[in-house]
Amino acid sequence: MQREVGPQVAPPMFLHQIQPLPPHATAAKKRGNPWPAAAVAAAEAKGGGNWNPRMWDWDSRALTAKPSSDALRVNAGLSHHQQQQQQSPPAAAKAAEALRQGGGGSGGLNLQLGLREDAATPMDVSPAATTVSSSPSPPASSAPAQEPVVRPSKRVRSGSPGSASGGGGGGGGGGNSGGGGGSYPMCQVDDCRADLTNAKDYHRRHKVCEIHGKTTKALVGNQMQRFCQQCSRFHPLSEFDEGKRSCRRRLAGHNRRRRKTQPTDVASQLLLPGNQENAANRTQDIVNLITVIARLQGSNVGKLPSIPPIPDKDNLVQIISKINSINNGNSASKSPPSEAVDLNASHSQQQDSVQRTTNGFEKQTNGLDKQTNGFDKQADGFDKQAVPSTMDLLAVLSTALATSNPDSNTSQSQGSSDSSGNNKSKSQSTEPANVVNSHEKSIRVFSATRKNDALERSPEMYKQPDQETPPYLSLRLFGSTEEDVPCKMDTANKYLSSESSNPLDERSPSSSPPVTHKFFPIRSVDEDARIADYGEDIATVEVSTSRAWRAPPLELFKDSERPIENGSPPNPAYQSCYTSTSCSDHSPSTSNSDGQDRTGRIIFKLFGKEPSTIPGNLRGEIVNWLKHSPNEMEGYIRPGCLVLSMYLSMPAIAWDELEENLLQRVNTLVQGSDLDFWRKGRFLVRTDAQLVSYKDGATRLSKSWRTWNTPELTFVSPIAVVGGRKTSLILKGRNLTIPGTQIHCTSTGKYISKEVLCSAYPGTIYDDSGVETFDLPGEPHLILGRYFIEVENRFRGNSFPVIIANSSVCQELRSLEAELEGSQFVDGSSDDQAHDARRLKPKDEVLHFLNELGWLFQKAAASTSAEKSDSSGLDLMYFSTARFRYLLLFSSERDWCSLTKTLLEILAKRSLASDELSQETLEMLSEIHLLNRAVKRKSSHMARLLVQFVVVCPDDSKLYPFLPNVAGPGGLTPLHLAASIEDAVDIVDALTDDPQQIGLSCWHSALDDDGQSPETYAKLRNNNAYNELVAQKLVDRKNNQVTIMVGKEEIHMDQSGNVGEKNKSAIQALQIRSCNQCAILDAGLLRRPMHSRGLLARPYIHSMLAIAAVCVCVCVFMRALLRFNSGRSFKWERLDFGTI
């Protein structure tokens, strides 16, 4: 009132009138006194990014932040200090009451209450911002430093558990809001009874926990059912197709709706705000008319309460007549000479329209008024005819739209109305997209953009606030096929090469991919030198976007099975990734990367945010944003405003789709969220190859952000550390000594960081052989799990996994370091190298194995630490059997007995969760034939481990999953394979040494398809030693004795009394259980002592005498003079030649 009366009085009195205002500001400052002034000033200067990680406990799996014990103690002290302060003045009390009551509104209010005169931004009192804590609230500027209570994930609807009589606009939790006084909302699955008091509003409303909402099978009402993602209720399994998350009925309806237009966003764009009363009524009539038509043809009737009611045909005719009367003076010169409707808009008319239109809304309405010649002609037709049919009316409106849409779209694509006429005419001559095609399909309007025009002028950002009406009307009045879906996002960029003389280059949007330009071409050195920072002014490919845009890429419409989520149906190749196996039965290292889940990282840097501003349903929003593709997901936060690193395991096709359409996906994230966490402020999103920035409705895609000085880890040693021990890691990679580089390590939801010291020699800063060290603290409670080692410099870098396990498993995993250190990373800037990277190389295969093993160890550690049967069993249950199969094959092929045993123990724990999982696990183990593989490799240690592995069931019964008589292909058992292999005595010994002695019993009785036993196989291949070994074991078992081979002699140990009392008592005292122990101990106990007999022992004397006798005889014969009766005497010395 004072500001309205002020101009009527003298200036001194006006200044005197506003004197009562300062007490309000003083009261606000007095309320802010209990908070540390330095902390508040620092928070305002830093934009909320100077928060202390020790004050928050972060759940890396649920993506929720809670105040730590230190924060609770600090808040308790502050609350006690606040109670001793003076009560706030009445004006401030009224303001606080207004804040509390403002949360009950439907959309929230932006109020400037005068508490701070210097505050330029209005105070947000929307339900998401009016969080009430247990203690009196500080001023809004210091609110982030305070612990909030659980806020609702969405506005609570009537009838939901969160809207029960709890009062006050609800915190979303509701406590016992599900029913009566002492009850609480619980999951409807049999034997679950999960408390949904603190669960999301969606889960409380539908009475299903998060786990059973995603599982493929659940027992509900003594019947196996599955939760439908679209119906939000359970259906029998017979109503679902294999691999589908929605029932067939809803999928069929989705397929029908998919072929129609989606006018939801168009209708929301066309609505004029209620406070814009200065706009002309004719513009309101045009917009409302087209809005009604959009509502008639869509499936969203009743979803938008602000849309006017549907009039009958008489009212529509009256509106058109009104428009005709307004433009009667101008319609004669612009109407076509023929009374028939001309669906082809002339080029000259479009050119004039382009010259007259601008980006502002007022000039756009003028363009709409000048393009109503179709309405004028048809209005005359209405006077001549009787009541026209509905199809005739829709034809008239489509004609008018055909003549009005090119202006708006062209204005949108051009970005400015002062372009030269030469460029416009040239653009129209080379782009026939504005002309309706000759096949009489539905009208399509696309923007025309010249290549040179787009390259010469600098990019411009088109910002569309929520309160403004977009200056374009991308509306189709008739149903169309998939080919007719326009993609407005790509139009300006797709036709940059439209001047090409090759007709194949000028493809229509219906046959072109969503983004045809190359965001990351091969860069020169000069380009890399220019792009040295990721700052806000970096050269970017700026695409015109607004919050109202929801048009998904064209290629995504080809899927007819998965439900539409956030306005974008997923790619059809997703389902094949879910059902595909991770590796081959014979060679796991030759599997294709497309059939495996890839582990990657998405980083969000949120400016001006801190953990208190993170919504409670952040995990659900990210999962919905990624179209439920992630199989695994973890997140870690650290200061620097708020840096959220998301590690996800998704199919390779999902990663590729995200990289190709990151700009559009970020728009979907902002528009699909109901919270201001994404909509307001500024944030960056980084994947492995792209960077997108968002600020106040404008989205940018970085043209090239990876530079030649980007730090990159190529090797970490050791790759496996013992849990609970302090370890020093050696990091190798590129550009690790650049100033500003930091090393981070994820640990139990927090980060351990280290600043890299700059190299003393400037010439060695940018090199490919940097070496750094990083010390791990060795947390005692962390026995099994995984670290992620990250390097970062200016929001660029990569990560490397490190496994946490026991010493024996770490020793086996460290054998992979040779494979990792010997190979190099693939440079993704080259197309050829990127194509070759599609085939997993040895290093990629090792990293994939470490990532998968890390996900499993994380789940196993969580289940072990929690010691909750329900949560732990269900947690491991979602680690698929196919992924277990891959890990078992990879480990067993390398003869890692310790790791294989650990994996089998975790698998056994998982299989005990349900009978179906047990059956599925046994089928998987029977398919991969681990024992057969060990026999072929002649791995006696692995074979002995497998045949002796036992699973103890809940009823104390024992199950041996690896039996030596299990028949494989052709009826061959592991015994047959061992009998046919040479030098496999140890393998036969291990197979016939199983606890149940099945191997001994089946050596003669197990037959293959040809009726041959293992004994026969051994005889045919002259492996008689195997039969002798088995026969000796059978005799020993029959006689209750043990046979030990010492050299080539057999020593029989009769356990019934054949051995001396001394030896017998010694053996019984040692309780020999293993044949190896028997051989070692009994060889020392039973070997007779050999007394030294010197050199005159009898065997030596006999040999020496024999040799001496032979030597004497030879010498006598050779030296004697021989005489013969005939001939002269013979002497050996004169022997030359002659006869004897």
From Swiss-Prot:
Annotated Zn(2+) 1 binding sites: 187, 192, 209, 212
InterPro entries in UniProt: SBP-like (IPR044817), SBP_dom (IPR004333), SBP_sf (IPR036893)
Keyword DNA-binding in annotation: yes
Motif Bipartite nuclear localization signal positions after renumbering to this chain: 244-260
Zinc finger SBP-type: from-to: 184-261
UniProt-annotated stretches for the region Disordered: 73-112, 124-177, 327-382, 403-472, 496-517, 558-597
Gene3D superfamilies per the UniProt record, alphabetical: Transcription factor, SBP-box domain
Biased composition (Basic and acidic residues): 450-466
Listed Gly residues bias regions: 164-177
Sequence ranges of Low complexity compositional bias: 76-100, 125-135, 403-430, 579-593
Pfam hit, one: SBP
Amino-acid positions noted as binding Zn(2+) 2 in the UniProt annotation, renumbered to this chain: 228, 231, 235, 247
Entry superkingdom: Eukaryota
Tissue expression profile of the protein: Expressed in stems, leaf sheaths, and young panicles.
Primary location class: nucleus
GO molecular function, one term: zinc ion binding
Compartment list: Nucleus
GO cellular component, one term: nucleus
Protein keywords: DNA-binding, Metal-binding, Nucleus, Transcription, Transcription regulation, Zinc, Zinc-finger
Positions with biased composition (Polar residues): 345-375, 496-514
Domain notes: The SBP-type zinc finger is required for the binding to DNA.
Role description: Trans-acting factor that binds specifically to the consensus nucleotide sequence 5'-TNCGTACAA-3'.
Name of the protein: Squamosa promoter-binding-like protein 15
